[in-house]
From Swiss-Prot:
Its main location: cytoplasm. Required for maturation of urease via the functional incorporation of the urease nickel metallocenter. GO terms for cellular component: cytoplasm. The gene is ureD3. This is Urease accessory protein UreD 3. It comes from Methylorubrum populi (strain ATCC BAA-705 / NCIMB 13946 / BJ001) (Methylobacterium populi). Transmembrane segments: none annotated.
Length: 311
């Protein structure tokens, strides 16, 4: 890949062997199939602004909006996919930087749909940087890998010691109400995250790898009885992490629970990880919002607005 070097390196991932056939319609990474987005936020005259915006379709951000009534100084940027989802051969790069003392919220306009594939795969590389005293909420909507799809995502995160990042992914195991074979019917879902300090010290790395036919999916304490999962990172100073963990109540009921969730500490005193599973997306989203509300209150001293009506 000439547009973005690290994106080309993803093709060497072990799990992609057997998925490198070129699509018949348009070759992988052709013009129109490489989306790029760069967002830079900084503090200017006491206000956080989107000072750097670069986009290449099918990824699009138009401008920063200030619609969060609880944090009117928070620039909000919904990422729009003009292609209506991710197709075979698509390659995306997303770079987000929050400067010193600035804050931002980045989300998506709706679910991230990964369409059915008969050749190749789709890949995404993300760089997320939060500088000293910065605060970023990067919470994309749920990812839905369709039957037969192959998707690989790599996220590299750099967070200063006194900054806070709330980032994570929610995944629905296919279009569960569309077809009996949709549930975990995708060929490949590979998502890895690496967290470092500005000096390069690695704090944490995790990889989720689900391949078609993996029997562990049906195990108890994995996904038996559930169709949605979420992993949400809260990278924050140790004192703040301790207060958040103390306030968050583990949700675990032995009586046919709609959702199960809990918080654990990240290695190297880097922060916290929320893990949640649920029956439907709204069950898991409720757990994410419960965690999100506590994080915002402890870090910024601001409440989380009620769920928008369009949700």
């Amino acid at each position: 890949m000439t547009l973005h070097g690290p994106l080309g390196l993803l093709d060497t991932a072990r799990e992609l062997r057997g998925f490198r056939t070129e699509p018949a319609q348009m070759r992988a990474g052709a013009p129109g199939k490489v989306g790029r987005l760069r967002l830079g936020f900084s503090l200017r005259d006491g206000v956080s602004v989107l000072h750097d915006l670069y986009r290449v379709a099918p990824l699009l951000v138009q401008q920063a909006l200030y619609w969060d009534e609880a944090m009117p100084d928070l620039p909000v940027c919904p990422i729009i996919s003009v292609g209506g989802g991710i197709l075979q051969g698509d390659r995306y790069t997303i770079d987000i930087t929050v400067g010193e003392g600035a804050c931002a919220h980045v989300s998506t306009q709706g679910a991230n749909r990964i369409h059915c594939m008969d050749a190749n795969y789709a890949a995404q590389h993300q760089n997320v940087t939060v500088e000293a005293g910065g605060y970023l909420e990067y919470l994309p909507d749920v990812t839905i890998p369709y039957r037969g799809s192959r998707f690989l995502s790599r996220t590299e995160i750099v967070v200063a010691e006194d900054a806070t990042l709330l980032y994570g992914e929610m995944v629905l195991a296919g279009r569960k109400h569309h077809h009996a074979e949709e549930r975990f019917g995708f060929d490949l879902l590979s998502m890895d995250v690496t967290l470092r300090r500005p000096g390069g010290r690695k704090l944490f790395a995790e990889k989720i790898l689900i391949e078609r036919g993996d029997p562990t999916i049906a195990f108890a304490a994995v996904m038996r009885g559930f169709d949605v999962f979420a992993n949400i990172l809260c990278v924050t100073p140790p004192g703040t992490a301790a207060r958040i963990k103390e306030r968050f109540e583990t949700n675990f009921s032995s009586d046919a629970p709609r959702a199960v969730s809990g918080v654990s500490r990240l290695p190297n005193a880097a922060g916290l990880m929320l893990r949640a599973v649920g029956v439907e997306t709204y069950d898991v989203r409720n757990e994410v919002r419960r965690f999100w509300r506590i994080v915002r209150e402890e870090v910024r001293g601001r409440p989380l607005p009620a769920e928008p009506y369009w949700r």
